[in-house]
Amino acid sequence: MFTRLAPRLQPQLLSTKRVLTTRYPTLVRTPIFHQTPIQIIKRNYVIVHKERKKEPVIRYLFYMLVASWVAIYFVANRVDKKKPPKQSFTEREFQSYEEETGLKRRNKLISHHMNSKYKFYVIPYVHDEEELNRVANLLQHKDENATVKIIDPAQLIEEQKKDEGMKYHYLLEDLDEQGKPYPPGLITAVIKQEIYKILNTREGTFDTNFLIKNYPQTTNEAIKFENDISDIQKCLILHYDMLNELPKNKTDEEQRAIKNVDGYFSSVGKSKTLVEKFDPMDKEFEDIILEDI
């Protein structure tokens, strides 16, 4: 019977031998018919260990992540440095410009305990230069020991435009070329620079009453002045100019803004209306004004 099956099994045995020879050469060196039972059992229980894939260590991933963040940070900074300087500003952007360039101080320029030495009076709108001088004379008569210093913001702006060494020269030049309005706070910043210069000269050693012409013309400028420079002693309203000259020289929007300044200071008891213009002031009226200023 075995002799009959041998021819049939011979192809299968040869095929098995090839597979075993390929996969387990050490186990098929001896023909299957000549192997001992121990060799056959050993062949069936051979365990092949597959190579394990090495998984990345967590700390290496962490290092790579940190390195990526650092690279992004430096690239972003280099891009920001290449951005051209911006010269047209909103109010918030102008505040940032002041902080970046060191033009903005954290505290008021005139501290509270210096308010008696330096006093500030503002006239939101004056058309007649002669009337401005009359108000200056009233202030001088009120306090003969103090000097009166008239500040004209329009004149300061022109000085900034003419001198390339001034801090706001290029900003003002750019805004004028583009036909854009001055951002809120710019005029106050120019006034602040002028007052700072005065305080650091011999003139600043004396008691001084500052009279600021045609300023503030918006409530934002008024608030910024009191936040950055000093308290305003009195807002002087020239009744005749406000009633007759203002409509001739300002738009409706500008007129409303200037009148709102009067309302702002009236709400805190700092507004005074001067009603005399052409008629000579008698002694009684002058005394009333001096008591109230």
Swiss-Prot record:
- Please provide, in alphabetical order, the Gene Ontology terms of the cellular component aspect for this entry: mitochondrial membrane
Which InterPro entries does its entry note?
Answer: P-loop_NTPase (IPR027417)
The main location is mitochondrion
UniProt KW keywords: Membrane, Mitochondrion, Transit peptide, Transmembrane, Transmembrane helix
First and last residues of the transit peptide = 1-27
Regions crossing the membrane: 57-76
Q: Give the membrane topology, semicolon-separated if more than one.
A: Single-pass membrane protein
Cell location: Mitochondrion membrane
Q: Which family does it belong to?
A: Belongs to the AIM36 family.
Q: What is this protein called?
A: Altered inheritance of mitochondria protein 36, mitochondrial
Q: List the gene name.
A: AIM36
